[in-house]
């Protein structure tokens, strides 16, 4: 008879700190071994429960759920110990989830989740306790030579768990196993307590031990050869067979048999697939269905009062009846499916958000197709006007939970979640956990670090793995020849790779789902344990989004959409200004959708900062499409995707719109005029999933529910299923007297485009948001751009683009200023955008609060006044330096001038003095503060300072900043150049040989020349091992990525430095990946090279006094130090004559920046310049 044994202690990958067991391989291994049951006891969690339960039940293996827990010590200073709890029944499940949740909420200390002994005693019903062998407090007492203490503890736990307590023993070849085992056997005999054998499993196969050790080291942040790392595991902790365990404990057969007895006692029935909603409060005397109908019809009347004003609408009753019929149809289905409660809950929290100043999106996903959602103000787009289908959202022929994804303003989303928690009970509302895994690139670095390999090797190997969504190590190995070759020749790289493959995809950490929130009908722990951080914040379910829904909880998506925040910020500024002139506040929901200036802006593709329409590729499509109505904008969102772009659908759509191609419904060769109403909005093109459904309805008599099933089948592309569906479609068409050939051809066309079809409901809702942002940009450009800049102010690349757009729009922009700026970008009374202080690096909300609080007493007069008045505990020297170099303190300097030209002329002197005075200003302020705090008058520290004294007197001789120094200061603090650009120094001359700016480049096969500064550089090797490079060029007008393949890179390598000014020649093409342009470089020149190659001569304009004695010698020495190939001509003026002199060939020079700057410093900027051919 084969041995019987059940593993009762096992950690999966979800233990996070250790454990390498993955659920599916575990179930497969158990099936192969013929084991009837298994327990999963992850450390402090039940995150894997649903996956484990489903997979085990599916394979005919009995799942036992449990957990290993850290137990507090009676002595607060004593060591922690473990216990293992197994669930016997539903009450045990609830108790274990309560214990684990309580541990996270109330028991976290120093990164450990600790369960108090009293909690276990209070919640022991329905649970079996294993003593955790040598890691339990009884085992620790035995090993510590305290048998009396061990006995007392065992008696205590036997009383708490009568007939449900087991002394656990192990033989895993770890220190103290046998000592604890012998003590447990003796104690069992004395007390009559049963023994149970476990193997404390951490991995499936014995050879996985090394991988497990590596995983543990990655979690600890230590290397395998680090003597400080924990060594708590052995290679015996694998999933041993029943025979191996029986042999291991052949002297203690009862300990093996008890594993089976425990398995028999554990009978948990996890109900999966049934959904539970909280009760929505309804008025007395009404059922939920009656109330649901009432609020829906009340909402319809409110909507129709705007959509169909009774006094001005022709055929009012007939038009109203269309809405009533659709509403009744939807209500019947929703009630029949049992979902009124879901709609009412969503309606309630959206209405609360709108009533409490939290902007809500007009809709998202297929939910925008529901009229019930529209009349309940869950969505804000009329589904009838845009042919949006309810069945795309809720299909009565395929019952599944409705799923509204709701967009909220980022600033207010958490307030809405807090409202829901308050309404339904904080113990019933939670967000949802996510699990981060060891992904392809990251696992290579993690393994290399754990193995003690060099950073350089880890970096090199990781960079060979392509940065693509869904990339795996196996895929990377197959497609990257350079990677395969490297692994073959480098032994250390091969070691990393082999281990990384074993650990790839293993769960590494936890996070919070972007928007998922669950609302339980009772307390959450009846369904799922809770996880949270040490502060008790950020409560999340321990089941992920799929598992939590399987467990019966309904997920609501509270998503944060940055664009809604932008619209909200813009409206606050707009309505502030409207209030000043007694105009009513603007409501974005009621702007006209046929606004001419908005469509003019869109047709010109001036869509930087417009939601969804910002990329270069999108702008090109907009220019071709020339959209002139909201239907076109909705279509645009659906068209700009890889499928339509690559299929020719986009060109066909554009040509049909502009009359360059025949309108056909759907194809010139096989038309069915009955499809015209369905396809007219898209000029006969099958663009939307809803159109696929409507074609099946119109031609073949499908219900829209059945048509949705057809659409789904087409998306799966299973040949047998498609053949069946094709037959049904043709048969349905025959019933409508439609020719079989025509039906077959149209079916084939629909099938082809079904794969490209987009959800029109989503496209329409997001198209409306795009229109709203375009409308704001067209009518209120400054408030809109200030809001966009505020939303993106920590994304330097975006700010650069947006500031350039502000300049293109000819909006006025004020530099940051401590006297007028707020944290965010704002608009002042003159309509100028004021730079936000929060956009300065190192200046967070704390320093800005200190500044705005201090200036309530009046504007700052100078740097000393500023330092004396602000709280220097919140503004340190580094912050002050950043404020000066960004220009935020320019107005406090001695050379500031309100007139722009005068300000620009003195800006470098001004900032130099401020920087020089900074230390003294800080010391003076600190001294004043100390004196004030001590309560003594400072007799000498300011008593005799005159009101108009020059506080900068001793600093005025500070060396003036150079243009480069000033601009570097701005780049370091703002991430961009505000008062100029390094290219300004060269602007006049580079336009002689690089006539195009980056923003003006267009794809062409001809070689184009552009000049700019290298702001990013990336070097890698091609498949042959040759170096190639990628640089990002910036010329203030824009940025472009340029690629240098091996030959070009080799020639230009010495010139490729960050912040270097270069002139580049190459071919410009579209970059499908970024949606922008890419430059393939043929040649790179430094500015000196470009001058040498393209300049005719260096021209000097000098007078007699410039060439006397020392000056002439100085000039000769300087020119000798810069010999080269560029000729010099001199325009010489004496009191008697003016002549043009050509220097001889021996005086030819290299026109380097250093030479030109030295000459300009000596003779003046206007007297030294390069002449070009």
Curated annotation (Swiss-Prot):
Name of this chain's protein: DNA polymerase III subunit alpha
Gene3D superfamilies: 1.10.150.870, Bacterial DNA polymerase III alpha subunit, thumb domain, Metal-dependent hydrolases, Nucleic acid-binding proteins
PANTHER family in alphabetical order: DNA POLYMERASE III SUBUNIT ALPHA
Reactions this protein catalyses: DNA(n) + a 2'-deoxyribonucleoside 5'-triphosphate = DNA(n+1) + diphosphate
SUPFAM superfamilies: AF1531-like, PHP domain-like
Gene of this entry: dnaE
NCBIfam families: polc, PRK05673.1
Native species: Pseudomonas fluorescens
Record's keyword annotation contains Ribonucleoprotein: no
GO terms for biological process, alphabetical: DNA replication
Signal peptide: none
Annotated function: DNA polymerase III is a complex, multichain enzyme responsible for most of the replicative synthesis in bacteria. This DNA polymerase also exhibits 3' to 5' exonuclease activity. The alpha chain is the DNA polymerase.
Presence of the UniProt keyword Oxidoreductase in the record: no
Family matches, as SMART domains: POLIIIAc
Example of a GO MF term: 3'-5' exonuclease activity
């Amino acid at each position: 008879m084969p041995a019987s044994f059940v593993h009762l202690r096992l950690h999966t990958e979800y233990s996070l700190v250790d454990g390498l067991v993955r659920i599916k391989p575990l179930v497969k291994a158990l099936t192969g071994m013929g084991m009837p049951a298994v327990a999963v006891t992850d450390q402090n969690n039940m995150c894997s429960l649903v996956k484990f339960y489903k997979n085990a039940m599916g394979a005919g293996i009995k799942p036992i759920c449990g957990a290993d827990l850290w137990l507090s010590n009676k002595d607060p200073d004593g060591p922690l110990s473990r216990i293992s709890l197994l669930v016997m029944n539903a009450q045990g499940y609830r108790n274990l989830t309560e214990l684990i949740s309580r541990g996270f909420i109330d028991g976290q200390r120093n990164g450990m989740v600790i369960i108090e002994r009293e909690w276990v005693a209070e919640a022991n019903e329905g649970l079996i306790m294993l003593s955790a062998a040598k890691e339990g407090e009884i085992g620790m007492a035995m090993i510590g030579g305290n048998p009396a203490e061990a006995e007392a503890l065992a008696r205590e736990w036997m009383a708490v768990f009568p007939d449900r307590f087991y002394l656990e023993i192990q033989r895993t070849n770890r220190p103290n196993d046998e000592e604890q085992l012998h003590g447990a056997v003796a104690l069992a005999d004395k007390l009559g307590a049963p023994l149970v054998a476990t193997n404390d499993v951490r991995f499936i196969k014995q050879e996985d031990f090394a991988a497990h050790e590596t995983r543990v080291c990655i979690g600890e942040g230590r290397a395998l050869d680090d003597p400080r790392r924990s060594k708590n595991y052995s290679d015996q902790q694998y999933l041993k067979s029943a025979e191996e365990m029986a042999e291991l404990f052949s002297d203690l057969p009862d300990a093996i048999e008890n594993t089976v007895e425990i398995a028999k006692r554990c009978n948990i029935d996890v109900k999966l697939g049934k959904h539970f909603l909280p009760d929505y409060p309804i008025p007395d005397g009404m059922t939920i269905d009656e109330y649901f109908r009432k609020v829906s019809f009340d909402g319809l009347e409110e909507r129709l009062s705007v959509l169909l004003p009774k006094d001005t609408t022709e055929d009012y009753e007939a038009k109203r009846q269309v809405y009533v019929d659709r509403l009744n149809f939807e209500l019947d289905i929703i009630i029949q499916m049992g979902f009124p409660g879901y709609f009412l809950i969503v309606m309630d929290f959206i209405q609360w958000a709108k009533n409490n100043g939290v902007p809500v999106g007009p809709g998202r996903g297929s939910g925008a197709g529901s009229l019930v959602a529209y009349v309940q103000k869950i969505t804000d787009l009329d589904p009838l006007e845009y042919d949006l289908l309810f069945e795309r959202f809720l299909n009565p022929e395929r019952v599944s939970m409705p799923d509204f994804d709701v967009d909220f303003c980022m600033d207010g989303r958490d307030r809405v979640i807090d409202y829901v928690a308050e309404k339904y009970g904080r113990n019933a509302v939670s967000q949802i956990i996510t699990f981060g895994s060891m992904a392809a690139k990251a696992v290579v670095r993690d393994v290399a670090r754990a193995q003690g390999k060099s950073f350089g090797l880890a970096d090199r190997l990781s960079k060979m793995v392509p940065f693509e969504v869904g990339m795996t190590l196996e895929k990377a190995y197959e497609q990257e020849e350079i990677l395969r070759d490297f692994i073959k020749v480098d032994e250390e790289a091969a070691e990393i790779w082999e281990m990384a493959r074993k650990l790839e995809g293993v769960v590494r950490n936890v996070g919070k789902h972007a928007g998922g929130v669950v609302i339980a009908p009772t307390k959450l722990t009846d369904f799922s344990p809770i996880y949270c951080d040490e502060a008790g914040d950020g409560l999340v379910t321990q089941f992920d989004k799929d598992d939590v829904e399987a467990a019966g909880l309904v997920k609501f998506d509270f998503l944060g959409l940055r664009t809604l925040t932008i619209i909200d910020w813009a409206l606050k500024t707009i309505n502030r200004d409207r209030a000043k002139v007694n105009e009513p506040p603007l409501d974005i929901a009621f702007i006209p959708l046929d606004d001419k200036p908005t469509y003019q802006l869109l047709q010109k593709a001036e869509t930087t900062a417009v939601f969804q329409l910002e990329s270069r590729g999108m702008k090109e499509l907009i220019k071709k499409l020339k959209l002139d109505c909201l239907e076109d904008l909705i279509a645009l969102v659906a068209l700009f995707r890889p499928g339509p772009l690559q299929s020719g659908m986009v060109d066909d759509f554009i040509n049909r719109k502009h009359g360059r191609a025949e309108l056909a419904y759907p194809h010139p060769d096989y038309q069915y005029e009955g499809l015209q109403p369905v396809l007219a909005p898209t000029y006969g093109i099958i663009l939307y999933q809803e159109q696929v459904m409507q074609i099946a309805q119109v031609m073949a008599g499908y219900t829209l529910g059945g048509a949705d099933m057809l659409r789904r089948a087409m998306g799966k592309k299973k040949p047998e299923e498609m053949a069946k569906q094709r037959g049904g479609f043709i048969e349905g068409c025959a019933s409508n007297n439609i020719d079989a050939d025509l039906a077959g051809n149209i079916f084939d066309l629909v099938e082809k485009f079904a794969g490209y079809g987009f959800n029109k409901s989503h496209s329409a809702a997001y198209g409306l948001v795009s229109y709203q942002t375009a409308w704001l940009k067209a009518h209120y450009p400054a408030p809109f751009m200030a809001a966009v800049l505020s939303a993106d102010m920590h994304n330097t690349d975006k700010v650069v683009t947006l500031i350039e757009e502000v300049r293109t729009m000819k909006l006025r922009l004020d530099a940051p200023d401590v006297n007028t700026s707020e944290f965010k970008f704002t608009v002042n009374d003159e309509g100028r955008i004021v730079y936000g202080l929060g956009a300065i690096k190192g200046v967070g909300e704390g320093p800005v609060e200190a500044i705005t609080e201090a200036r309530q007493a009046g504007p700052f007069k100078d740097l000393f006044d500023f330092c004396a008045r602000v709280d220097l505990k919140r503004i340190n020297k580094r912050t002050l330096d950043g404020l000066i170099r960004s220009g935020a303190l320019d107005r406090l300097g001695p050379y500031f001038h309100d007139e722009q030209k005068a300000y620009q002329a003195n800006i470098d002197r001004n900032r130099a003095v401020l920087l020089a005075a900074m230390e003294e200003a800080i010391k003076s302020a600190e001294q004043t503060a100390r004196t004030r705090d001590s309560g003594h008058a400072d007799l000498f520290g300011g008593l005799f300072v005159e009101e108009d004294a020059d506080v900068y007197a001793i600093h005025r001789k500070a060396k003036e900043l150079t243009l480069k120094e000033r601009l570097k200061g701005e780049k370091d603090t703002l991430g961009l150049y505000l008062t100029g650009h390094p290219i300004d120094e060269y602007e006049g001359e580079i336009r002689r040989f690089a006539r195009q700016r980056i923003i003006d480049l267009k794809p062409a096969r001809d070689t184009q020349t552009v000049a700019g500064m290298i702001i990013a550089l990336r070097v890698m090797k091609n498949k042959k091992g040759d170096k190639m490079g990628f640089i990002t060029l910036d010329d203030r007008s824009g940025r472009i990525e340029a690629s240098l393949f091996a030959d070009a890179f080799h020639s230009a390598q010495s010139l490729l430095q960050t912040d270097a000014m270069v002139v580049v020649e190459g071919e410009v093409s579209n970059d499908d990946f970024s949606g922008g342009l890419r430059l393939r470089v043929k040649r790179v020149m430094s500015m000196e090279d470009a001058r040498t190659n393209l300049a005719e001569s260096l021209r000097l304009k000098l007078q007699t006094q410039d060439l006397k004695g020392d000056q002439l010698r100085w000039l000769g020495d300087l020119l000798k130090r810069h010999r080269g190939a560029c000729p010099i001509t001199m325009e010489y003026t004496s009191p008697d004559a003016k002549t043009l002199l050509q220097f001889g060939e021996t005086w030819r020079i290299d026109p380097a920046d250093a030479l030109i700057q030295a000459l300009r410093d000596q003779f003046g900027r206007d007297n030294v310049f390069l002449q070009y051919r």
